Amino acid sequence: MSEYISPIWDIEIGSYTVQKITRFDVFSSRQAPLDLAEVELPKAGLPTDVDAGTRVRISQGYREKGMWLIFDGEIERMEPRSVTTTIFAQDQGGKLKRTPFSQTFIQIEPRAIFQHGLQKAGIMAYKLSSKPLPPKASFVAGGNCLEVFKRVNAAWGLDWAYYFEPEGEFYWGPWEESPRYLQAELTKLEYGVNILEPTRVEEGGRRGLITTFAMPWIRHSHRVIILDHRHFVDPIEVRVERCHYHHDAQKARLTLEWSRGKK
């Protein structure tokens, strides 16, 4: 499709605006509340002060459509090679992973535990569900914040995702209350139009995988419409479980895993 012919990108590493890359990949998932990015770029021109902890921002888009931020985080480590350097970065979930959280709570609701953990990690922008949940007589937090948050969901029997928007806000709550569920418009992925590789369908049509053109406006937990008569008689609405954004000199792609039938 002509509208997807010329994808563009913008990468900032600290105060340095990247001019050339070999590739970048961004991985984002409902199941792993820590977005990861890899940027491979020429050594030449990379400032010497770029190191672990340096901020990384990645945007992708099209001149005719605009740009979308798909990653905002910090460098975790760097791997120099002969002519290129690969940068590995984590989003703000890295702060939660690095922050120890050990505390005993009495008569506590899960929202309050999340608030304590976020404050310990210095996270001030967040949206937590206000849905009433029964308090536990006691809860012992131990480990880092991400580990504790996972245990909180398990202790209360919740299938609630928690993640950072690339713009910085942390979200925890039911899928149907999330900003991503409440999106204004659903993207259509159609066989013969913008589905690029054979659709993998599993579990009797409950799960699958699609590769399409770069669509940086799609994020995990969004809803999309799939039209593929090879597998489904009618269009189906699915939830995006994982996103892999890829960009190199030859192509820009989005590979997404999807599921349907649960919230």
Give names to the regions the model predicted.
Residues T22, S28-R30, E76-E79, A161-Y163:
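Short, exposed beta-strand/loop patches in secreted or surface proteins that constitute
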Residues G73-R81, S138-G142, W175, E237-A249:
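Short, compositionally biased
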